[in-house]
Amino acid sequence: MEQDILEGKRILVVDDEHDVLDTVEDLLSMCEVTTASDFGRARDLLEADTFDLALLDIMGVDGYGLLELAVEKGIPAVMLTAHALSLDNIKKSREMGASYFIPKEEMVHLTTFLRDIFEARA
């Protein structure tokens, strides 16, 4: 049986909604997930640690500021949002270096999206 490409990946998940953090932790049980619910904590984690990927909420936690930090550290970043799904936000995320943009309504497919990202980078 082929090993899951997500197995053991270190993922930083940042969202100000604790139910979203819990859901992502459940969905990514094969990964080492670290969570943060505010910009300051997420910034500290990004500066002090190494992650294979950062999953960042756009609204509520200054996702664009965190995206900039992740890109500077060479950490692939995926933008996650429920309310900021607009062409401008998608464009800005891509221009700033985001690897992917996932609406929260599509979180059920999160593992598929992340596998695709890691396979494309392999």
List each language-model region with its residue ranges.
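Alpha-helical interaction/dimerization surfaces of two-component signaling modules
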Residues: 23-27, 45, 69, 92
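Non-catalytic signal-transmission and effector/linker regions of two-component phosphorelay proteins
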Residues: 1-12, 108-122
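Acidic, metal-coordinating helix/loop segments flanking the phosphotransfer/catalytic sites
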Residues: 18, 35-53, 61
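Hydrophobic/aromatic residues positioned on beta-strands within the core alpha/beta folds
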Residues: 80-82
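Two-component/phosphorelay signaling modules centered on CheY-like receiver
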Residues: 18-34
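Short amphipathic alpha-helix used as the core "switch/output" element in two-component signaling
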Residues: 59, 64-76
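Alpha4 helix (beta4-alpha4-beta5 surface) of REC/receiver domains from two-component response regulators
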Residues: 65, 84-103, 108, 112
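Conserved acidic carboxylate
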Residues: 15
